[in-house]
Amino acid sequence: MRTPRVLTATGVLVALAAGTAAAAAAPSPPPPPRPQITDAAVEKAVARLDGTVAAMMRTTGVPGASVAVVHDDKVLYLKGFGLRRTGERGTVDPDTVFQLASLSKPVSSTVVAGALSDPAEWDAHVPLPGFALKDPWVSDHVATADLFSHRSGLPDHAGDLLEDLGYDQSYILDHLRLEPLDPFRISYAYTNFGFTAAAEAIAAARGTSWQKLSADTLFKPAGMTRTSTEFSAFRDAPDHAATHVKNPDGTWSPRYVRDPDAQSPAGGVSSTARDMSRWLRLQLGNGVLDGKRVIPADTLARTHQPQILSQPPTTATGEHTGFYGLGWNVSYDDAGRLRLSHSGAFELGANTNVTMLPLEQLGIIVLTNGAPVGLADAVALDFFDVAEHGRATTDWLAVASALYAQALDAGRSPTDYAHPPAGAKPARNDSAYTGTYDNPYYGKLTVSANPDGSGLTLSLGPKPLKFPLTHYDGDVFSFETAGENAVGRTGVTFADGTVRVEYLDVNHLGTFTRQ
């Protein structure tokens, strides 16, 4: 997902959840927080899960889900629901492989924590050949922690549109140097490819690949036998959950395949509820699993600490301050308890969530195979609400679905290109627009006349994606965007030997010059 969508939605949900704990008058300074959730309360919340998940799946229509709950180092709940793929018989179980989307980030920060020998190494600059930022000083000083906490200065989702156009990881990381920068270490903007660059640098510095480092450092030692950072492993798993999107008639279809290898550390992990329950036990166990230390406690603890403000408090709604750690959303509730969470969302068909209260030794994993409509977040929020209050105090599905819908709409153009204005001017002859245009960031763009005389087609990307143009007004056309970051119809404006593509111009990089 693009724009502040996922992080805004996730951040608000975390802030709302943090506000559900009962407030109490606290002395100054307040005492350390104490556990508040009893075993009986957890059992009650677990007992509700079957009905909660089933009801939310009926409401949303999401085809499949898999859920795990860990408490006091025990897996209390592990269950699959629904179908791996609509139209087929295969059902979801705890060993069904799902794409994690951005839930990959806390998994990847666990890998890096395992690769480091000292927490201070998070603050070291680790160079990666081919990667630089626009400011040379920032390039020479940006640390792993800066990129893992989205405070490098890169703009929101920098590089994601290049991935949509089909560019590979090497091209994308090399071209991030053209992105404008916000102030270093004081600006928060969620960036999959900044995160990816840091992870790849850690692996390269150790003479290995990110895939091998992940397997050797975390997956194998933790017994996560069905977990991988490679799309091919997900694709080839016979029991994987296909990604689904919602059709206009309310049904769901596996229309798209999402290959996230270019941003593997940020969004390319695939796993099962069973494997993720082991990872959750490791997180709550401070790096220890089944009596064996897998990840150093001190380097792992650093991932759970706030690194930058991501969600300012909102007095009007009572939302709490939210922070971003190293691959984690970090917040504190009214009782002072640390709450860690992260959601994953592929518009092409996946939605996931992890939420945990370390002090309570309680966490939940929710994996789904439908585009983000709030199901994964709502199941997790409802579970903790019941564990803390004995009942659901909020319709979390309504809250989460509204936030995701709002975030999706926020990326759309303010212009309704489907309806030209009254008195729209005609287009010029096709020859006024056809030709090859160049852009240092996005590469070549071609505009060609359709052989049958039906209009123009715009082509973009290394293996050109073709977009039929629809005339709007004068020298302005439009086309329907496609891919993970699609935003509906976007404008294409020709002027003085240039063409500006509206949705590519979010960081003022979307103007192409005619050759």
Task: State where each predicted segment sits.
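Secretory targeting and sorting signals
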Residues: M1-P27
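Catalytic loop of the DD-peptidase/beta-lactamase superfamily, centered on the K-T-G motif
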Residues: A25-V75, A203-D216, K220, P254-Q515
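Short, conserved catalytic-motif segment at the N-terminal edge
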Residues: I37-L100, P119-P129, K134-P136, D168-E179, ...
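Solvent-exposed, acidic/flexible segments
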Residues: D39-V46, V62-P63, V97-K105, P119, ...
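Active-site helix/loop module of the DD-peptidase/beta-lactamase fold
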Residues: R48, G64, P94, Q99-L103, ...
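Catalytic-site signature segments of enzymes, centered on catalytic residues
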Residues: G80, L154-H240, D249-R281, L289-I295, ...
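Generic structural signal for alpha-helix termini and adjacent loop/cap motifs
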Residues: R84, D118, H150, L282-N286, ...
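Active/ligand-binding-proximal structured segments within catalytic/core domains
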Residues: S108
